[in-house]
């Protein structure tokens, strides 16, 4: 990964691959790239992980463009392979929505579809060899005059807690919105304060239900992040091994990891559907 003859240790190699390309505002008011994790921490809230943002937006755009173009060409006569694939995915999503969502809301199925496909695409970046995109980013950085040791690129968006928390917070906002819309502000407040032990235990009920409510987005985010971060770490550790050992370990792990990529997207999507169903239920 180095553009010089400097020896790269295992520790520095791992740290380099686990650090995001961070741009933000330093305490002195200036905006620039972080060269170390400590500099990234100094930025506080105003720190943007450009690698996570760029990869996630590019994959999201590819998803929308692909589905739009295939949708425009859909036909009932001789469907293409792409059309058959999309129809299969949509049928799969609809089956899950019908099985878990017992109310009527035309937004839930598109939300589930977008969530599933987008997370699958972001998770799939974990199957790209760990040095490819960081190397490209380093070469671009050198071309722009940057020190290659200070050019980072973490290519799996879902291995960044900011991405998974961002998605789960979006889902959390929808849960709150539909809970109030379907049950009314009073009904939603009663759900948080009068259950599970009745009105006499209102403070205790509020504590339990509040924790349960907040745990939904937190568990959504951390489950996805933890699994993808662990998978990325294993690929990085395999990359530290001799070349002949890498292929004997990386291929079986990559094949197994395909299951993790799909399973984590499916779990996230399923929980989104379940949480949306709970938000629409009139009774707790």
Curated annotation (Swiss-Prot):
Subcellular location: Cell inner membrane
Annotated SUPFAM superfamilies: F1F0 ATP synthase subunit A
Bilayer topology term: Multi-pass membrane protein
PROSITE patterns linked: ATPASE_A
Superkingdom, natural source: Bacteria
Keywords tagged on the record: ATP synthesis, Cell inner membrane, Cell membrane, CF(0), Hydrogen ion transport, Ion transport, Membrane, Transmembrane, Transmembrane helix, Transport
Cellular compartments per GO CC: plasma membrane; proton-transporting ATP synthase complex
GO biological process: proton motive force-driven plasma membrane ATP synthesis
Transmembrane segments: 47-67, 108-128, 156-176, 233-253, 254-274
InterPro entries cross-referenced by the UniProt entry: ATP_syn_F0_a_bact/chloroplast, ATP_synth_F0_asu, ATP_synth_F0_asu_AS, F0_ATP_A_sf
Gene Ontology MF: a single term: proton-transporting ATP synthase activity, rotational mechanism
Main subcellular location: membrane
Subunit structure: F-type ATPases have 2 components, CF(1) - the catalytic core - and CF(0) - the membrane proton channel. CF(1) has five subunits: alpha(3), beta(3), gamma(1), delta(1), epsilon(1). CF(0) has three main subunits: a(1), b(2) and c(9-12). The alpha and beta chains form an alternating ring which encloses part of the gamma chain. CF(1) is attached to CF(0) by a central stalk formed by the gamma and epsilon chains, while a peripheral stalk is formed by the delta and b chains.
PANTHER family: ATP SYNTHASE SUBUNIT A, CHLOROPLASTIC (PTHR42823:SF3)
Family: Belongs to the ATPase A chain family.
Name of the molecule in the record: ATP synthase subunit a
């Amino acid at each position: 990964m180095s553009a010089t003859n400097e020896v790269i240790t295992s520790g520095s190699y791992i740290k380099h691959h686990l650090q995001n390309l961070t741009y933000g505002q330093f305490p002195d008011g200036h905006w620039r790239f972080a060269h170390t994790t400590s500099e990234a921490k100094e930025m506080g809230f105003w720190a943007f992980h450009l690698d996570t943002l760029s990869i996630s937006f590019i994959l999201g755009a590819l998803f929308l463009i692909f589905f739009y173009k295939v949708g425009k060409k859909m036909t009932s006569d001789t469907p293409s392979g792409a059309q058959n694939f999309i129809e299969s995915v949509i049928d799969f999503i609809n089956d899950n929505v019908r099985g878990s969502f017992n109310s009527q809301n035309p937004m839930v199925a598109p939300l589930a579809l977008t969530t599933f496909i987008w997370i699958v695409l972001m998770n799939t970046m974990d199957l790209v060899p760990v040095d490819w995109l960081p190397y490209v980013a380093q070469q671009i950085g050198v071309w722009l005059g940057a020190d290659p040791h200070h050019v980072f690129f973490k290519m799996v968006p879902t291995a960044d807690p900011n991405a998974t928390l961002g998605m789960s917070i979006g889902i959390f906002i929808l849960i709150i919105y539909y809970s109030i819309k379907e049950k009314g502000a009073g009904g939603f407040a009663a759900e948080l304060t009068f259950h599970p032990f009745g009105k006499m235990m209102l403070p205790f009920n509020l504590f339990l239900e509040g924790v349960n409510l907040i745990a939904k987005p937190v568990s959504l985010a951390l489950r996805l992040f933890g699994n993808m971060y662990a998978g990325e770490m294993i690929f990085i550790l395999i990359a530290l091994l001799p070349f002949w050992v890498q292929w004997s370990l990386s291929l079986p792990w990559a094949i197994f990891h395909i299951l993790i990529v799909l399973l984590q997207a499916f779990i996230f999507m399923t929980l989104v559907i379940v949480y949306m169903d709970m938000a629409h239920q009139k009774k707790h």
